[in-house]
């Protein structure tokens, strides 16, 4: 959609209860690890979300905030009234630069240790369950009082409410076991409590798994029944994720268990080797089940959606109502503005190498590998929008290195480089990107036999593209003109 008009559905407004979103693009909650151990908003957190707001997604969901005062590392909290003033300042700062609507996600998580031990929902007593329900209600009121447009309840992945929903919840009472009605009980109590506390006119969203993606976990069939229950209890939108479970996580000795290291973690954050839109079918099935029962709750789909063409096709085909983009909007927060303005050809595309995920796994501050090394946030577009240019007589060099194709190019003083490849007479396809300091790329996705051609495009801070350098061609076993 290079230089084309903005997609008509993607930039239509959508109403959620009394809240109108200016477009259908959602920035889902992402861990940043930018706050202090005390859970307060600091300058880095404020700057990160103001930068996202400048890109103008329809809805921006702030990272999960603990509803309880347990030690959580550098994660935000909403567990006491003392957090409200700084949260209010963050909302005001974002509103000052953008029409984006702002929600906050709230979460309860169980205890884990470096030994690999973790608390489960089966360990919780009735008093503890009642406290969790109260904590969610209290935190939701704080979110409302801080000025957020909506609150989102975290019921996905490895955390407490998702663990109650899980088929792996083996409690032998009314809060678990084989009966879905029992597994729904605590999440339903939380939703009812939050609705009671925030009132009938305040939007409530729920983020939960469309499937657990683990052995003996629930599938989209259960997820549809869960959606119907949530809709009938007053949820105003449903944001569909997948996986992210402890059950198949890989434990590194001496480190706390991280729930995104197994296959279910791949399903939650699909990397480059998975197809685009991997999890859309989950939202599609859930939405169809809701509509069949006369329930019009909007459904958000997520999971490796990066192009306006794919986003628009999902909306047009009725597979979802809203498009969630996390890593793509981390790579380029200005995606919505660029696409709306007909400049999709200036988007800095996410390469889905999951460096951001690896940083979270190591408890480091989360950033994008495509940013300059000195940047803590995505750089602002420069006033000078001129594209990088290649040096005179620049050429693209290809060589075979142990079954891979090495692509090398000269320095164009660029923010980054896009590597494109085609096989035979097919179209050129973007296969990866590199920061401006990198001047080569090794392509491991090739085989002997076909003729491959490569081009490299340099891009500036605002995504402005140079003319392609190349093409240059190769077959494994030798270079061909």
Report the location of each language-model feature.
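Flavin-dependent oxidoreductase catalytic cores
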Residues: 1-389
């Amino acid at each position: 959609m290079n230089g084309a008009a903005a997609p008509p559905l993607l930039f239509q407004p959508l109403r959620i209860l009394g809240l109108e979103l200016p477009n259908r693009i959602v920035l889902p909650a992402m861990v940043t690890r930018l706050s202090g151990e005390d859970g307060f908003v600091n300058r880095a957190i404020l700057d990160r979300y103001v930068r996202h707001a400048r890109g103008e997604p329809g809805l921006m969901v702030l990272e999960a905030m603990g509803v309880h005062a347990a030690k959580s590392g550098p994660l935000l909290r909403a567990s006491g009234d003392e957090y409200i003033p700084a949260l209010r300042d963050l909302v005001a700062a974002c509103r000052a630069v953008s029409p984006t609507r702002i929600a906050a996600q709230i979460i309860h998580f169980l205890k884990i240790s470096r030994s690999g031990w973790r608390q489960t929902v089966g360990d919780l007593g009735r008093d503890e369950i009642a406290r969790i329900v109260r904590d969610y209600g209290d935190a939701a009121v704080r979110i409302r009082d801080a000025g957020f447009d909506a609150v989102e309840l975290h019921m996905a992945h490895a955390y407490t409410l998702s663990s109650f929903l899980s088929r792996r919840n083996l409690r032998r009472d009314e809060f678990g076991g084989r009966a879905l009605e029992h597994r729904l009980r605590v999440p339903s109590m939380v939703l009812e409590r939050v609705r009671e506390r925030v009132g009938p006119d305040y939007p409530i969203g729920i983020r939960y798994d469309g499937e657990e993606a683990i052995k003996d976990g629930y599938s989209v069939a259960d997820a549809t029944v869960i959606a119907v229950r949530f809709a009938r209890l007053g949820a105003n939108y449903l944001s569909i994720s997948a996986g992210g479970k402890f059950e198949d996580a890989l434990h590194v000795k001496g480190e706390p268990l991280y729930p995104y290291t197994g296959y279910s973690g791949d399903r939650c954050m699909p990397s480059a080797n998975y197809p685009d839109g991997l999890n859309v079918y989950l939202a599609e099935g859930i939405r169809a089940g809701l509509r069949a029962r006369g329930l019009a709750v909007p459904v958000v789909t997520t999971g490796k959606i990066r192009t306006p063409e794919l986003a628009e096709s999902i909306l047009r085909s009725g597979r979802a109502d809203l498009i969630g983009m996390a890593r793509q909007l981390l790579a380029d927060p200005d995606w919505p503005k660029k696409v709306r303005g007909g400049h999709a050809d200036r988007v800095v595309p996410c390469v889905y190498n999951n460096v951001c995920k690896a940083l979270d796994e190591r408890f480091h501050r989360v950033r994008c590998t495509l940013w300059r090394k000195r940047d803590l946030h995505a750089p602002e577009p420069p006033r000078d929008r001129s594209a990088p240019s290649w040096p005179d007589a620049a050429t693209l060099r290809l060589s075979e290195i142990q079954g891979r194709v090495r692509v090398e190019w000269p320095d164009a003083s660029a923010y980054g480089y896009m590597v494109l490849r085609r096989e035979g007479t097919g179209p050129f396809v973007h296969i990866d990107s590199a920061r401006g300091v990198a001047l080569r790329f090794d392509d491991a996705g090739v085989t002997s036999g076909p003729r491959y051609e490569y081009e490299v495009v340099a891009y500036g801070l605002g995504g402005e593209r140079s003319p392609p350098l190349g093409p240059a061609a190769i077959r494994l076993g030798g270079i061909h003109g």
